[in-house]
Amino acid sequence: MKIAIVIDSSSGLTKEQANKRGWYFLPLNIDIDEKTYKDGIDLDNKNFFEIFKKNSKTSTSASSRGEIISLFDDITSKYDKVVVFPISYKLSSQYQNLDLIAREYKNIHIVKSKHLSFLTIVQLIKFEKAIGQNQSFDEELKKLSHWDESQKVLLIPEYNDALVAGGRLSPKAAALAKVLKVVPIIKFENGELLKEGKGISFQKTLTKLISSLSGKYSKDSKNYFPVILHAQNSNISFYEEHFLNEFGKKPLILSLPSVISVHTGLGAIAISLVKVDKDVIDQIVEHF
């Protein structure tokens, strides 16, 4: 059975990276100061902050209908099945748009995703491995939508500028938070970005969270792998070393997807412990 996989830029991959893996790619759109960029094509997480400035006016939107139809028309006859794994349906209209369009095609399956970033990549590598072992396509397709309750993903913005610009934090609240050195702690859980709590000082909060996570999962550490994602944080090596010391494993370091960085701003860091086999991590390191 010949299967095509389609991802979007919420995975954190560029079109070139996805294609090297043998996957197809749909860019989400990022508007910066009234100019639209195709994420993963016109910009990526390496040059994003050369374009996005502190006071930039920004917004994000789903892939264009024309681009989706063009891709689907191109690949539907070349494969027995097409699996499309978009950004979490709770964060964007991308899933709804794809699902409506896919109804016109017999072999295109849209995953009702609760994932983004490296979690999407992990799910797809596991899916490919299972299909390669002749597991049921329908059963493995269902697993792509499953959220693992044991995993924890926490996100901490270093600055509040992007939260203010995006209307997620008032200027008055941001000013008070700056004086008090309060930082928000956001969790990504079951496909949603939710408030987890708050801390005092970015560095203190992050090191404390790394220590807390490491302690919580220490008894089952052989089955979990540490991951750090960041938006060009200049002090990333410090947190990498802290995770290594606390958990006993060197974390995988990745960049936050641009469609997330536009809302969290420069310096933001996400940390996670994910239950995954080492061969999956090795594939991520090798290909991405």
Curated annotation (Swiss-Prot):
NCBIfam families: DegV. It comes from Mycoplasmopsis pulmonis (strain UAB CTIP). It holds the Pfam family DegV. Hexadecanoate binds at S61, S92. The keyword tRNA-binding does not apply. Residues 3-275 form the DegV domain. May bind long-chain fatty acids, such as palmitate, and may play a role in lipid transport or fatty acid metabolism. Transmembrane segments: none annotated. It comes from the Bacteria. One of its GO terms (molecular function) is lipid binding. Keywords: Lipid-binding. This is DegV domain-containing protein MYPU_3590. SUPFAM superfamilies: DAK1/DegV-like. InterPro entries: DegV, DegV_C, DegV_domain_contain.
